[in-house]
Design a protein with these regions (language model features):
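Short helix-to-coil transition segments within interhelical loops
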Residues: 148-154, 158-178
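N-terminal signal-anchor transmembrane alpha helix
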Residues: 7-34
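Glycine-rich helix-loop "coupling/hinge" segments at transmembrane-helix boundaries
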Residues: 119, 197-226, 230, 235, ...
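Generic hydrophobic transmembrane alpha-helix motif, especially the helices
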Residues: 103-139, 146-147
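Transmembrane-helix boundary motif in ABC transporter permease subunits
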Residues: 72-102
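Transmembrane alpha-helices
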Residues: 130, 134, 166-200, 231, ...
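C-terminal transmembrane helix and the adjacent membrane-cytosol boundary/short C-terminal tail
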Residues: 92, 149, 226, 230-270
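Periplasmic/extracellular loop-to-transmembrane helix junction in inner-membrane transport proteins
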Residues: 3-10, 32-76, 215
């Protein structure tokens, strides 16, 4: 069975690669028809700008600055969400606290808090971390709490019947059963945080010290280097695809798919 698994992976990547090539061809044709590189650079011009930025070290430096802030804020947001979820699972008052806070803050766009963050923490890393923690914490807390709440009572009883209790019951039964919902919350939190970070650097000019990817796009727009703007956008998309494909899909494949808790899509990598 294992020997057959490279086939679906190869075919899936082939289909996606062909789709990307088709989109790039349409982009190139539209840019040539528009014939205005200031408004719409071609795919080839963007590729050259992207390659030049990578080879010069300019783009990797901006990417590293953005990811450093994102990883720090993401870790803090995950920790805060787990604390809130633990309180909600442990007592009625904790549940009321989680429900009240998520009802208040989950619908609130993180970027709307940035003006306050700039007043409180100034123009720098702390303001970005504050709004990114807000982006991560509430969707993850909601999904984690829903995941733990949906664990069937029969599954808990089965764990107790084989001698599991306390921490062993939590780690061997509860967390694996709630993991699909928790992974969904982690992915939603990542997506919210990533786009909030780029928007904050782009719209408000907020930087993490040496500037991030959004700042690179902002500066390129000011200097009318539209090809570099598109190169920065391509970097944003590429990082999103890499995190989704290499991190989250790998975790899903090694956990919930292997355990039979999530159905594998036809043609997806096994």
């Amino acid at each position: 069975v294992r020997a057959d698994r490279p086939g679906p992976l190869r075919h899936a990547w082939l289909r996606k690669s062909l789709l990307l090539l088709l989109l790039a061809g349409l982009w190139e044709a539209l840019a040539r028809w528009q014939d205005n590189a200031l408004l719409l650079p071609s795919a080839l011009q963007t590729a050259r700008a992207f390659a030049a930025g990578m080879l010069s070290g300019e783009l990797p430096g901006y990417v590293a600055a953005s990811l450093a802030v994102l990883v720090q804020a993401y870790a803090l947001g995950v920790a805060g969400a787990l604390v809130l979820t633990s309180l909600a699972l442990g007592s009625r008052s904790g549940r009321d606290l989680l429900e009240t806070l998520t009802a208040m803050f989950n619908p609130l766009p993180a970027i709307a808090l940035l003006p306050l963050a700039l007043l409180w923490f100034g123009l720098g890393r702390a303001s970005l971390v504050f709004v990114l923690v807000h982006s991560v914490m509430w969707p993850l807390a909601l999904n984690a709490y829903a995941g733990f709440g949906s664990v069937p009572e029969t599954l808990r009883m089965a764990g107790r019947n084989v001698g599991l209790n306390g921490a062993r019951l939590v780690f061997q039964v509860m967390i694996p059963a709630a993991l699909p919902a928790m992974l969904s919350g982690l992915k939603i939190g990542w997506a919210f945080a990533w786009r909030t970070l780029i928007a904050a650097e782009l719209v408000f000019g907020t930087t993490s010290g040496q500037g991030g990817l959004g700042w690179y796009i902002f500066q390129s727009r000011n200097e009318l280097f539209t090809d570099k703007v598109f190169a920065g956008l391509a970097a944003v998309i590429a990082i999103g695809l890499l995190v989704e494909g290499l991190v989250f899909q790998t975790v899903e494949r090694l956990t919930v798919r292997r355990w039979g808790m999530q159905r594998q899509a036809p043609g997806s990598p096994g």
